[in-house]
């Protein structure tokens, strides 16, 4: 089975990587779809985020990374995905993700959304938290791969 894992991944965190690994173990194939959203100012370009993800997932079998614009269900359909994969850190994530899952089903009922609970030690992680800690010079190497930490440090020293 092929799972579509959509997101902005700005930047990719160890929480994302854990979900990708577990998705690969469960479904065999994970298509990581990086959202290109021109109305949202990204820290890293879409191309750079794709490079970061490809580097971070090179040892995870069945992973592929693409850019996408538009609706998640359209991306799933165009790439022959079987399901949509999403992670949950807290109850607040569930409320939002459930609404998105229902919206996706209303647009194309072919796609189920499968939720995986984040590992407890990653439950505090979000891309926003990582960027905030990095902005103030805090240690982030336990939150993101080393090369992403270096990318963020370069941005914050310029």
UniProtKB/Swiss-Prot annotation:
Transmembrane segments: none annotated. Gene3D superfamilies: HUPs. It is found in: Cytoplasm. GO terms for biological process: coenzyme A biosynthetic process. One of its GO terms (cellular component) is cytoplasm. Pathway: Cofactor biosynthesis; coenzyme A biosynthesis; CoA from (R)-pantothenate: step 4/5. This is Phosphopantetheine adenylyltransferase. NCBIfam families: coaD_prev_kdtB, cyt_tran_rel. Its EC number is 2.7.7.3. Substrate binds at residues 8, 40, 72, 86. It holds the Pfam family CTP_transf_like. Its cofactor is Mg(2+). Keywords: ATP-binding, Coenzyme A biosynthesis, Cytoplasm, Magnesium, Nucleotide-binding, Nucleotidyltransferase, Transferase. One of its GO terms (molecular function) is pantetheine-phosphate adenylyltransferase activity. It catalyses: (R)-4'-phosphopantetheine + ATP + H(+) = 3'-dephospho-CoA + diphosphate. It comes from the Bacteria. The record marks 16 as: Transition state stabilizer. ATP binds at residues 8-9, 16, 87-89, 97, 122-128. Homohexamer. Reversibly transfers an adenylyl group from ATP to 4'-phosphopantetheine, yielding dephospho-CoA (dPCoA) and pyrophosphate.
